[in-house]
């Protein structure tokens, strides 16, 4: 494996294992309605969600347009989303290598997914490619340790009582965005 391939496999395997329990953690889904508003949707918009997980964002988007596709690189997340939202469209896709034609979507949406991509720059280039001219890309990320009291406290506790070196594969910097 080269570069961040080990990180990509680690992330994919982790999300495959957590698909059925991810919905129990309502932390990230709380931002979905606010982030969807930022898309400024109209009823005829064609929307792509990346890293859709169990489909909460896709479901919220579907309230404003029926042309929405949720995607995730973890097959079990796609299965979970289809179970929770059987009337919506989901498919497995790699955000870093999308199979869609250029200029296919009016809007692209991704909540807290970018930090799980081994090559976020590739994913953003793919968004640029599949997004129509004048389209909108809305994404969310966690605030940096310096800006987030929660992550600051967590970082301080780990530094004092443990170690950040827990054998995780190298990945892109978590606060690049």
Regions found by a protein language model. Give the residues of each.
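Conserved catalytic/acceptor-binding region of the Class I
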Residues: 122, 128, 136-177
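Conserved class I S-adenosyl-L-methionine
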Residues: 1-45, 56-60, 77-80, 84, ...
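Class I SAM-dependent methyltransferase SAM/SAH-binding core
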Residues: 48-98, 122
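Short glycine-centered segments of the SAM/dcSAM-binding site in methyltransferase folds
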Residues: 46, 135-136
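A short acidic, Gly/Pro-enriched loop at the edge of an enzyme's catalytic core
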Residues: 96-108
């Amino acid at each position: 494996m080269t570069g961040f391939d080990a990180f990509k496999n680690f992330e994919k395997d982790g999300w495959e294992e957590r698909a059925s329990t991810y919905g129990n953690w309502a932390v990230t889904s709380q931002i979905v309605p606010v982030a969807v508003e930022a898309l400024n949707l109209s009823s005829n918009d064609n929307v792509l969600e990346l890293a859709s997980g169990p489909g909460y964002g896709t479901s919220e988007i579907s309230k404003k347009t029926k042309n929405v596709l949720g995607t995730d690189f973890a097959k079990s997340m796609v299965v979970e989303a289809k179970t929770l939202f059987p009337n919506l469209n989901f498919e497995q896709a790699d955000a870093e290598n999308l199979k869609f034609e250029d200029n296919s979507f009016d809007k692209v949406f991704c909540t807290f997914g970018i930090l799980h991509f081994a090559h976020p720059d590739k994913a953003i280039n793919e968004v640029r490619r599949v997004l129509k001219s004048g389209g909108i890309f809305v994404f969310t990320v966690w605030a940096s340790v310096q800006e987030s009291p929660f992550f600051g406290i967590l970082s301080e506790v780990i530094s004092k009582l443990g170690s950040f070196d827990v054998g995780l594969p190298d990945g892109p910097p978590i606060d690049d965005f």
